Regions:
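Oligomerization/assembly interface segments of phage tail-like spikes and tubes
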Residues: 51-64, 101-111
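Intrinsically disordered, low-complexity acidic/polar segments
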Residues: 45, 68, 114-116
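Small/polar-rich, solvent-exposed N-terminal microdomains that initiate assembly or binding
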Residues: 1-49, 64, 71-72
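Mid-chain, well-packed structural core segment of small domains
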Residues: 59-82
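Short intrinsically disordered coil segments
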Residues: 49-54, 74-76
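Acidic-leaning, charged glycine-interspersed low-complexity segments
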Residues: 74-116
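Short, solvent-exposed beta-strand/turn "edge" segments of beta-rich domains on protein surfaces
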Residues: 46-51, 96-98
Length: 116
């Protein structure tokens, strides 16, 4: 297992809007904003000194304007690509009660892990 949280968070924060861990979201946050959560972190290949882990993260853009969601989704792609991530899933969801729109994206990468 490899820990990519710090690299991912640093890249997302460079976008310039608030970034939150998905499990700590609460009502009343200012939007647009980004949330993230690790979906999967599994060892796919392992040797004596190194291995590979397949990582999946769910990244959401929250807002009330579809144009904001599209703009920030493209910026997220641009920031995560150099880390080796590619978008493997995407959908949108609207909440009638809050008038919030979510762009829900899944990113995946294969990460090299050095063993001590």
């Amino acid at each position: 297992m490899i820990d990519y949280h710090a690299k991912l968070l640093a890249s997302l924060k460079e976008i310039g809007i608030p970034v939150h861990y998905e499990m700590t979201l609460y009502s009343g946050l200012s939007t647009p904003c980004i949330s993230y959560m690790e979906l999967s972190n599994v060892s796919t290949q392992a040797g004596d000194t190194l291995g590979y882990s397949r990582l999946q993260y769910q990244i959401k853009v929250w807002g009330t304007q579809i144009s904001d969601l599209q703009k920030y989704a493209l910026l997220i792609d641009k920031k995560l690509r150099p880390l080796g991530f590619s978008r493997v899933g995407c959908n949108e969801m609207y909440d009638n009660n809050s008038s919030m729109i979510q762009k829900i994206m899944t990113y995946e990468c294969l990460a090299l892990e050095q063993f001590d």
